[in-house]
C-alpha cells in the first residue's frame, strides 16, 4: 500500500512539474518539463548519495578514524541483515543525521558532530537504527527523488512568474500570463511541499518503529529525539537553510522557525513520535537491553552513557523539550479532528 501511495504521489509531482512547464511554454513546455523530470529522476537515482553528501560537506570515516561510531553502525547493520553502509560525519553543531543512497547496496549514513558529541552511545544507536530502517524500506531513494523534483518545481515556478509577466506586458494578454505565473510561483511549490509531507510523515513513523526493533530498545531512540528536539533548532544549519528541499531527509527537521512540529512540516510532531516509541517499549517490556557495551569503548562520550528512563517516561507531559515542544503539543490539540485522527492512526501503524 505504501509503495502504491508513494508511486501515486511521485506521479502527481511529475504532473505538477509538467503543469508548470505548460504555463511557461504551452504544450512544448509541458513535453520539455516531462523530459526534464525523467532526466532529473535518472540522475538522482544514480547520484543521490553523492549529491546530498557533497552538499553537506560530509567526510567518510572508518573503523580507525571513528571506531565506536563505525562499530555501532556495523553492529546494527548486521542485526538488520543489511550490507555495511558507508559511514560519514558532517561538521555541524546541530545534532542531526540522515541516510541516503539508491538501494541498500549503495547506501550511506551521516551523523553530525553535534549529534555524536551530545548523545550517548545507545542514543546514537537509536538514531542510526532509524536511518538503517529508512535504507531497509528503500525510503532513501524516494526521499531524494521528491527533494529533486520539489526543488525543480520551485525553480520553474520562479521562472514561470518571470516569463508570465514578460508575456503579459508584450502580448497585452489582460493579465492571463501574469496570473499563470503567480499560480506557478506560489501554488505549485506549495503543492509539492504537501506531497513531500505526505510521503515523509508516514515513513518517519515506520522508520521509528523498525529502528527500535533493530537496536532492541525503543527508549534509546525516544531519548535521542527528545535531546535533538530540545536543542537542535537553536543551532543554525546553513546548508539546510540554503537547501530546504532536503529537510525531510533528516531525522529531525533541521530548519529554524516552528521546526519539526509545524502543521506544514515534513516531520511528525516529536512528542507524537516519542509517545509511539513509549508504547512500543511497553509492548516489549523486559526484553529491552539497557546497554550494548558501546559506551565502554575508548574515545566515546562516557559522560552521556546513562539514560534517564524515568525522566523520559515523563517527557511527553513535562518541559523536557522546552517551550517549542510544549507549544507543539498545543498546536496538535487544536488541529481538526480528522487530522489528529490521521496522526494517531499513523503512529499505531
From Swiss-Prot:
Chain segments annotated as transmembrane: 6-26, 27-47, 145-165, 175-195
PANTHER family assigned to the protein according to its UniProt record, in alphabetical order: PROTEASE HTPX
Stated name of the protein: Protease HtpX homolog
UniProt feature, compositional bias: Basic and acidic residues: 340-349
Organism: Bartonella quintana (strain Toulouse) (Rochalimaea quintana)
Keywords in alphabetical order: Cell inner membrane, Cell membrane, Hydrolase, Membrane, Metal-binding, Metalloprotease, Protease, Transmembrane, Transmembrane helix, Zinc
Database matches in InterPro entries: HtpX_protease (IPR050083), Pept_M48_protease_HtpX (IPR022919), Peptidase_M48 (IPR001915)
Active site: 131
NCBIfam families per the UniProt record, alphabetical: PRK01345.1, PRK03001.1
Cleaved signal peptide residues: none
Topology with respect to the bilayer: Multi-pass membrane protein
Family, per entry: Belongs to the peptidase M48B family.
Any one GO molecular-function label of the UniProt entry: zinc ion binding
Listed cofactors: Zn(2+)
Entry GO terms, CC: plasma membrane
EC number(s) stated in the UniProt entry for this protein: 3.4.24.-
Localization annotation: Cell inner membrane
Domain of life: Bacteria
Amino acid at each position: 500500500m505504501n509503495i502504491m501511495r508513494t508511486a501515486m504521489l511521485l506521479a502527481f509531482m511529475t504532473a505538477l512539474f509538467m503543469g508548470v512547464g505548460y504555463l511557461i511554454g504551452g504544450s512544448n513546455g509541458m513535453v520539455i518539463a516531462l523530459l526534464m523530470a525523467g532526466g532529473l529522476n535518472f540522475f538522482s537515482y544514480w547520484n543521490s548519495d553523492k549529491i546530498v553528501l557533497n552538499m553537506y560537506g560530509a567526510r567518510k570515516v572508518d573503523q580507525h578514524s571513528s571506531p565506536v561510531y563505525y562499530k555501532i553502525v556495523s553492529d546494527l547493520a548486521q542485526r538488520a541483515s543489511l550490507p555495511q553502509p558507508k559511514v560519514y560525519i558532517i561538521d555541524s553543531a546541530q545534532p542531526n543525521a540522515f541516510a541516503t543512497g539508491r538501494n541498500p547496496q549503495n547506501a550511506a549514513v551521516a551523523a553530525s558532530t553535534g549529534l555524536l558529541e551530545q548523545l550517548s552511545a545507545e542514543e546514537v544507536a537509536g538514531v542510526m537504527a532509524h536511518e538503517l530502517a529508512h535504507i531497509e524500506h528503500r525510503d532513501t531513494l524516494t526521499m531524494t527523488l521528491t527533494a529533486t523534483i520539489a526543488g525543480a518545481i520551485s525553480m520553474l515556478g520562479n521562472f514561470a512568474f518571470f516569463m508570465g509577466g514578460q508575456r503579459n506586458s508584450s502580448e497585452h494578454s489582460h493579465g492571463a500570463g501574469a496570473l499563470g505565473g503567480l499560480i506557478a510561483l506560489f501554488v505549485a511549490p506549495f503543492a509539492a511541499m504537501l506531497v513531500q509531507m505526505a510521503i515523509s510523515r508516514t515513513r518517519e513513523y515506520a522508520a521509528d518503529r523498525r529502528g527500535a526493533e533493530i537496536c532492541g530498545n525503543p527508549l534509546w531512540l525516544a531519548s535521542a529525539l527528545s535531546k535533538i528536539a530540545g536543542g537542535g533548532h537553536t543551532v543554525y544549519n546553513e546548508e539546510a537553510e540554503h537547501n530546504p528541499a532536503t529537510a525531510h531527509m533528516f531525522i529531525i527537521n533541521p530548519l529554524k522557525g516552528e521546526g519539526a512540529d509545524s502543521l506544514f512540516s515534513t516531520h511528525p510532531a516529536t512528542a507524537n513520535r516519542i509517545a509511539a516509541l513509549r508504547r512500543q517499549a511497553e509492548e516489549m517490556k523486559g526484553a529491552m537491553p539497557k546497554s550494548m557495551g558501546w559506551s565502554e569503548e575508548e574515545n566515546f562520550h562516557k559522560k552521556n552513557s546513562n539514560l534517564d528512563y524515568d525522566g523520559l517516561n515523563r517527557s511527553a507531559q513535562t518541559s523536557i523539550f522546552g517551550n517549542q515542544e510544549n507549544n507543539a503539543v498545543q498546536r496538535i490539540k487544536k488541529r481538526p479532528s480528522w487530522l489528529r485522527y490521521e496522526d494517531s492512526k499513523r503512529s499505531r501503524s
